[in-house]
């Protein structure tokens, strides 16, 4: 369905919409009187959303522990103890028989009768849950898109691609036609089983990583030797044993000392070779983010179907969910699922990683460069405020240790072949001590990063106050001055002959075209803006940026967006029972932000800022009211329009406690 665009005019006191007056409506989203709910329940207005860093504590690990203090149950923060277990099938069909029996009747499974899965397809179908019948999807959405369904007999829409008379699955069109459909709609950056096994079994050589880590170690060791307190010859002679009859030193000790001596000589050679060079400098592909429409990396909600939706709605650049370096190096399945991307995301797709040490950064970047070629940049997350990562030295903890951050970036730059390296930072870890302005100077002089993204908040601040765009502009100016100074230096003339401009991207609170264009038009030092929550609450924000007008999406238009998300979800996670459960869960996670959109047509003033909260309101129709509900049970009701009737055992607990609460 094509979106109907309605330009909203400025108005006076005649009851039409007015532009936002911050002094008049600070913290409050004003709704027209006729749309304010006639209810005594004021809980929605009082409830404050907690936009704690959108990150998956379920995957990273609970932040509590044996030593954590007992607290009263809070109404804000993450629901870390929520149950995300999925219901399993009573009878599970063997993967070898998903597409049916072999034509010659021979067994397809090497385990034969000893296999723990069902080989009798009719027996499996007799225990399979009923078909999903929907108005939104008359036939299997995956079959409709690709001409075949990879889920085969396990598909909950199987009747649309099943020949009952011959008891076999059907395909649509010729092989060439299906190949053409696949070329337009497929996923990239899939790591093979053999490649993953090489990581699990530690067979992958990490040649480049070992090289650069040796260089970094030699430089650090030389620095330690220089700064170590010097011992005089007299003191050294006093330390030696004076008794000639003392027992001789053990051979193992002598051997160890000899090995250390050789290692130190090797480190000395490396240091002399690379001390006056930018050893990390490599030829990279150009990275152009100028005026690009960028979606921020978003853990959990920033999954592949969501990114694909954002590409359809006008985004130019998308990022994977944050991947942890160590699980990547270890070949963990769940972590290697994160760099996957849809073909529509190429070019303009980046992978974000989090790490605490240079060896983690180097090996993760080398593995990504080797196994996932369809990426345009690798981004180091140096801004994540999650306590667990911070205590491990990852995320925003790197802001407190810029030397370590620089080593990580240089190691990544050395091993990533032609893939540019970028970094995302915050203003600092404490409100009273911003460090970004001094940090960018070091990044210019000591690294070859292609882009810097600055979130205009500190770690301490989280989302409690608005982003400081004045400071973002200050840092952008500092970056340009440092660039100019560096390029005039002898080192700069040698190392940056191409004089590539470091891309600078601002981030924080932008959710409308007015802020977007105002910031970029008023500050040439800022190349683009990264949008996070604004693109979750209002996915068509980039359509507004292009049109340079507010778009009042109707409930049917917003339902079409949800339908696209559901379609993309089923193509990604599948249409079997497990896939549908995954689709429903992530649909509800998406709704935990999408429901916060306040239709412009019911607003007294606009645009509504992210930190503004409305009183209870009703929409212009029942569907609009339903999509604006804060009750997770209503989100589940919406999911039934796309994924069928929900199981009685299905329970969805929003990640953020304040994202949803039952209505009275």
Curated annotation (Swiss-Prot):
Q: Which Pfam families match?
A: Dus
Q: Which reaction does it catalyse?
A: 5,6-dihydrouridine(47) in tRNA + NAD(+) = uridine(47) in tRNA + NADH + H(+); 5,6-dihydrouridine(47) in tRNA + NADP(+) = uridine(47) in tRNA + NADPH + H(+); a 5,6-dihydrouridine in mRNA + NAD(+) = a uridine in mRNA + NADH + H(+); a 5,6-dihydrouridine in mRNA + NADP(+) = a uridine in mRNA + NADPH + H(+)
Subcellular localization, as worded in the UniProt entry: Cytoplasm; Nucleus
Which stretches are tagged as biased composition: Basic and acidic residues?
Answer: 230-245
Q: Which Gene3D superfamilies match?
A: Aldolase class I (3.20.20.70), Zinc finger, CCCH-type (4.10.1000.10)
Annotated catalytic residues: 384 (proton donor)
The cofactor(s) it depends on are: FMN
User: Zinc finger, C3H1-type: residue spans?
Assistant: 88-122, 134-164
**This enzyme's EC code(s):** 1.3.1.89, 1.3.1.-
Region feature Disordered, mapped onto this chain? 1-22, 47-87, 230-261
**Its GO biological process terms?**
mRNA processing
According to the record, the segments passing through the membrane are none
What GO MF terms are annotated?
Answer: flavin adenine dinucleotide binding; mRNA dihydrouridine synthase activity; RNA binding; tRNA-dihydrouridine47 synthase activity; zinc ion binding
Extract the CDD domains matched here.
DUS_like_FMN (cd02801)
Q: What is its main location?
A: cytoplasm
For this record, an example GO cellular component is: cytoplasm
Q: Which InterPro entries match?
A: Aldolase_TIM, DUS-like_FMN-bd, tRNA_hU_synthase_CS, Znf_CCCH
**Keywords carried by this UniProt record:** Cytoplasm, Flavoprotein, FMN, Metal-binding, mRNA processing, NAD, NADP, Nucleus, Oxidoreductase, Repeat, tRNA processing, Zinc, Zinc-finger
Q: Where does the record place Basic residues bias? A: 67-79
- The record lists FMN as bound by 297-299, 352, 424, 455, 507-509, 532-533
> What exactly does this protein do?
Catalyzes the synthesis of dihydrouridine, a modified base found in the D-loop of most tRNAs. Specifically modifies U47 in cytoplasmic tRNAs. Catalyzes the synthesis of dihydrouridine in some mRNAs, thereby affecting their translation.
Family indicated by similarity: Belongs to the Dus family. Dus3 subfamily.
Record protein name field: tRNA-dihydrouridine(47) synthase [NAD(P)(+)]
């Amino acid at each position: 369905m094509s979106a109907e665009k309605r330009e909203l005019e400025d108005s006076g006191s005649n009851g039409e919409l007015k532009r936002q007056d911050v002094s008049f409506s600070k913290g409050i989203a004003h709704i027209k009187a006729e749309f304010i709910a006639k209810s005594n329940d004021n809980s929605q207005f009082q409830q404050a959303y907690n936009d704690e860093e959108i990150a998956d504590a379920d995957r990273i690990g609970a932040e509590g522990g044996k030593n954590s203090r007992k607290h009263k149950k809070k109404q804000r923060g993450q629901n870390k103890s929520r149950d995300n277990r999925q219901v399993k099938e009573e009878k599970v069909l063997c993967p070898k028989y998903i597409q049916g029996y072999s034509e010659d009747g021979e067994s397809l499974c090497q385990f034969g009768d000893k296999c723990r899965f069902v080989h009798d397809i009719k027996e499996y179908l007799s225990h399979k849950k009923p078909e999903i019948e929907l108005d939104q999807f008359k036939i299997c959405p995956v079959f409709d898109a690709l001409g075949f369904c990879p889920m085969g007999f396990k598909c909950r829409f199987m009747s649309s691609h099943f020949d009952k008379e011959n008891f076999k699955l059907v395909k649509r069109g010729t092989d060439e036609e299906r190949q053409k459909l696949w070329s337009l709609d497929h996923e990239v950056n899939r790591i093979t089983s053999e490649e993953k096994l090489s990581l699990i079994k530690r067979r992958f050589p990490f040649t480049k990583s070992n090289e650069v880590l040796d260089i970094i170690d030699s430089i650090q060791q030389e620095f330690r030797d220089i700064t170590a307190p010097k011992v005089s010859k007299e003191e050294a002679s006093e330390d030696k044993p004076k008794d000639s009859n003392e027992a001789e030193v053990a051979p193992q000790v002598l051997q160890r000392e000899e090995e250390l001596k050789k290692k130190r000589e090797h480190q000395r050679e490396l240091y002399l070779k690379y001390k006056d060079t930018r050893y990390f400098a490599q030829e990279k592909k150009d990275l152009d983010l100028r005026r690009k429409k960028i979606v921020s990396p978003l853990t959990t909600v920033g999954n592949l179907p969501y990114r694909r939706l954002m590409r359809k709605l006008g985004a130019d650049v998308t990022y994977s969910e944050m991947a942890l370096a160590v699980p990547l190096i270890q070949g963990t399945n769940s972590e290697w699922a994160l760099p996957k991307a849809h073909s529509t995301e190429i070019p303009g797709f980046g992978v974000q990683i989090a790490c605490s040490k240079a060896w983690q950064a180097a090996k993760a970047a080398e593995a990504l460069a080797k196994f996932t070629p369809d990426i345009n940049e690798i981004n180091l997350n140096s801004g994540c405020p999650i306590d667990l990562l911070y205590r491990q030295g990852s995320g925003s903890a790197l802001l407190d240790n810029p030397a370590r951050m620089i080593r990580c970036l240089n190691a990544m730059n050395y091993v990533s072949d032609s893939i540019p390296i970028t970094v995302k930072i915050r203003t600092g870890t404490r409100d009273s001590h911003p460090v970004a302005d001094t940090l960018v100077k070091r990044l210019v002089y000591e690294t070859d990063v292609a882009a810097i993204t600055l979130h205009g908040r500190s770690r301490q601040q989280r989302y409690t106050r608005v982003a400081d765009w004045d400071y973002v502009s200050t840092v952008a100016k500092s970056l340009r001055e440092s660039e100019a100074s560096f390029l005039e230096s002898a080192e700069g003339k040698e190392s940056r002959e191409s004089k590539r401009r470091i891309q600078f991207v601002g981030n924080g609170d932008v959710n409308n075209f007015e802020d977007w264009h105002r910031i970029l038009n008023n500050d040439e030092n800022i190349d683009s803006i990264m949008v996070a929550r604004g693109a979750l609450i209002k996915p068509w924000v980039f359509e507004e940026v292009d049109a340079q007008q507010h778009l009042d999406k109707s409930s049917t238009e917003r339902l079409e967006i949800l339908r696209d998300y559901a379609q993309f979800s089923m193509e990604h996670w599948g249409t079997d029972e497990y896939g549908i459960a995954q689709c429903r869960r992530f649909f509800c996670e998406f709704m935990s932000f999408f429901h916060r959109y306040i239709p412009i047509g019911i607003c007294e003033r606009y645009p509504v800022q992210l930190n503004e909260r409305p009183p209870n309101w009703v929409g212009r129709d029942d569907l609009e009211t339903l999509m604006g509900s804060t009750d997770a049970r209503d989100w589940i009701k919406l999911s039934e329009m796309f994924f069928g009737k929900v199981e009685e055992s299905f329970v969805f607990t929003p990640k953020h406690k304040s994202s949803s609460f039952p209505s009275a």
